[in-house]
């Protein structure tokens, strides 16, 4: 497993994993940043076991065969890839398999030459979707990198918790 320790910022309420060391390949105007936000579970990945919750750190697969290609194409076209995920069981996991699972997934993105930032809400507070604490952290982090203005018209958020009958919540819809 790749060592991401130098890219991880731990806080009592959140974790930030920053693999966005450079701006998107074709980004010419750092003042007009296009953000592509994604939920993790049920959007980018799912369990390989078919269970609702993962059994271990290896229990995952990409939701669709073309996920890496789509993310890479978005990055190469100048979008900033951001993952926002609620992981309230992270601190309760005795063997930390939840964080290890996330690191496995993010290593797969890194191996595909996709630069991204991942914001993980650990507690049920203002960082947890649908609250906007993770988004605020994201904007502050991007501003520190020199990205000053965000094109909301050319940005989006994609998640699975939309409040439909089959959904467990509507937090992604409200977050978007």
How would you name each of these model-derived features?
Residues 1-40:
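Non-catalytic pre-domain segments flanking phosphatase-related domains
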Residues 131-170:
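Conserved Lys-Pro-Asp/Glu-containing loop-to-beta segment of HAD-superfamily phosphomonoesterases
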Residues 109-128, 154-160:
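A short, structured active-site edge motif that brings together acidic residues
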Residues 48-51, 95, 168-171:
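Short coil/turn segments at secondary-structure boundaries
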Residues 29-31, 74-78, 113-115, 146-153:
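Short helix-terminating capping/connector loops at secondary-structure junctions
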Residues 43-44:
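Hydrophobic "anchor" residues
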Residues 87-93, 122-126, 162-165:
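Short histidine/acidic/glycine/proline-rich micro-motifs that form metal-
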Residues 23, 51-83, 90-111, 128-133:
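Short, acidic loop-to-helix structural element flanking the phosphoryl-transfer center
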């Amino acid at each position: 497993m790749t060592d991401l320790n130098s890219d991880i910022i731990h806080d009592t309420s959140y974790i930030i994993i920053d693999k966005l060391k450079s701006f998107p390949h074709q980004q010419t105007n750092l003042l007009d940043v296009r953000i592509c936000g994604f939920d993790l579970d049920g959007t980018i990945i799912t369990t390989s076991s078919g269970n609702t919750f993962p059994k271990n750190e290896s229990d995952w697969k990409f939701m669709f065969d073309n996920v890496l290609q789509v993310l890479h194409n978005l990055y190469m076209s100048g979008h900033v890839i951001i993952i926002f995920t609620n992981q309230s069981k992270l601190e309760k996991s005795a063997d930390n398999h939840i964080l290890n699972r996330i690191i496995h997934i993010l290593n797969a993105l890194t191996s595909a030459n996709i630069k991204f930032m991942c914001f993980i809400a650990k507690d049920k507070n203002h960082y947890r979707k649908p609250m906007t604490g993770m988004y605020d952290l994201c904007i502050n982090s991007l501003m520190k990198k020199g990205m000053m203005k965000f094109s909301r018209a050319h940005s989006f958020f994609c998640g699975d918790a939309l409040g439909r009958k089959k959904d467990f919540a509507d937090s992604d819809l409200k977050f978007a």
